[in-house]
């Protein structure tokens, strides 16, 4: 079996570029999580930063605990959407395969 170091380096560089692109796409992502049929919305970035919280005026007369629960649910919904829309971790396996590298399944990458 011939081992071509230059080909391996080219494949690794290609995979690194693809991973960088996937990370940038995630960083630029924005999602809106909601609860209470849209009465509470949370805008979150792909880096899990909450940019805004919107609470419908009709909830201002509600019990404090109800409002807290709705806010928590909206944040959790936004987190779920970031994870669902993030291509980074699933694309790593595809990128590695395209580069001729077999990764074992179940690896937890640090940016997932």
Curated annotation (Swiss-Prot):
Which species is this record about? Francisella tularensis subsp. tularensis (strain WY96-3418)
Segments carrying the region annotation (Disordered) are 1-27
List keywords of the entry alphabetically.
Cytoplasm, DNA-binding
Tell me the compartments it is located in: Cytoplasm, Nucleoid
Q: Can the keyword DNA-binding be found in this entry's annotation?
A: yes
Which HAMAP family has this protein been placed in? DNA_YbaB_EbfC
Q: What does this protein do?
A: Binds to DNA and alters its conformation. May be involved in regulation of gene expression, nucleoid organization and DNA protection.
Give the GO cellular component terms, alphabetically. bacterial nucleoid; cytosol
Q: Where is it predominantly found?
A: cytoplasm
Coiled-coil residue windows = none
Instruction: Report the GO molecular function annotations.
Output: DNA binding
Residue ranges under compositional bias (Basic and acidic residues)? Answer: 17-27
Q: How does it assemble?
A: Homodimer.
Q: Which domain of life is it from?
A: Bacteria
Under the heading Gene3D superfamilies, the entry gives:
Nucleoid-associated protein YbaB-like domain (3.30.1310.10)
Protein name per its UniProtKB record = Nucleoid-associated protein FTW_0607
Q: Which family does it belong to?
A: Belongs to the YbaB/EbfC family.
